[in-house]
Amino acid sequence: MHFPLIPMVKLEEIKQIFKPKLLPIIWNKTKLTLLDQSRLPFEKIYVDVTKVEEVSDAIRTMKVRGAPAIGITAGYGMVLAIQDSISLEKAISDLTKAKKILDESRPTAVNLMWATSRMLNKAKDLVEQGNAKSVKELKELLEIEANKIFEEEYEAELKIGLYGIEKVNDGDTILTQCNAGGLATGTGLGTALAPAKLANALGIKVSVIAPETRPWLQGSRLTVYELMEENIPVTLIADTAVGLVMFKKMVNSVMVGADRILSDGHVFNKIGTFKEAVIAHELGIPFYALAPSSTFDMISTVDQVKIEERSPDEVRSIKGVYISPKEVKVYNPVFDVTPPKYVSAIITEYGIIYPPFDKNMRRMLGK
């Protein structure tokens, strides 16, 4: 287990050196400006939202995607909820209604409910303790809280990126999967893409190979676009080319994000991750999962985690055009699970965790 402390000066330094070129979420006091990810990569369009209903719609229609990005967006949505509140009592009522509206926009998004609960509880505490004596004061203090949600996420990603750089050498090529970048987290940095972005900002030349990631094509639509915006060399490959690029030694390491990591080190991530891990293990290529500690599930066993399945038409068609018989049976799991034997290390904001994961993860979390 490797837990070097990140000197604060180094963290502050990297904040000055790296400035994201792609900002998916922009807050401007009375409005929230969102990059419409459903239109990428062919159209870069920002939309302004000023009402809770508009924020909910942006989440529901995938203008905003990725659990951390949804949480950040919801936090600012709660601030917008009291723009027109006429009293503190009405503000709490408006926030309660806003939480319900936002939570229903993506019922399975844990970060969404976490953010709206945090904002509502903060508002109640401020009013009950007399720290907000007017709606104006309450709005200002809630805006500070929403900014904290953003800043905490960004700082965690910076730390993940700095720890990840320890696994990168000048001239390396990293293989990734799906989109675990700043578009998914809302900060412009990301988790699995953070080491490549920070390395290049520090003058360490790193390139990335991105599989297309069927059926939603997050690799070709989002990861490639995001890295090109940051001027980081990236090569797009078909999902079926993953084995060959590793066999030909075109890859020095594999870095992926994670939707859930169990206490024993099982990693749940976008479908296709397991394949990369097995091939990397066979060929002696290190495989790293990069994720914040909020991703850890210290309770569930691998058999208890349900893997989501999506519409068969996502596989049968591309953008409404069928590429197979409409009647064919389809199995379309969104995620797969990588056993811990294939995971070289898990990189978090607290440090790098090596096997045995069940022991070292609990040590890190103090459990």
Swiss-Prot record:
Substrate binds at residues 65-67, 106, 218, 269-270. The record marks 178 as: Transition state stabilizer. Coiled coil: none annotated. The active site is at residue 259. Keywords: Amino-acid biosynthesis, Isomerase, Methionine biosynthesis. Its EC number is 5.3.1.23. NCBIfam families: eIF-2B_rel, PRK05720.1, PRK05772.1, salvage_mtnA. Belongs to the eIF-2B alpha/beta/delta subunits family. MtnA subfamily. This is Putative methylthioribose-1-phosphate isomerase. It comes from Sulfolobus acidocaldarius (strain ATCC 33909 / DSM 639 / JCM 8929 / NBRC 15157 / NCIMB 11770).
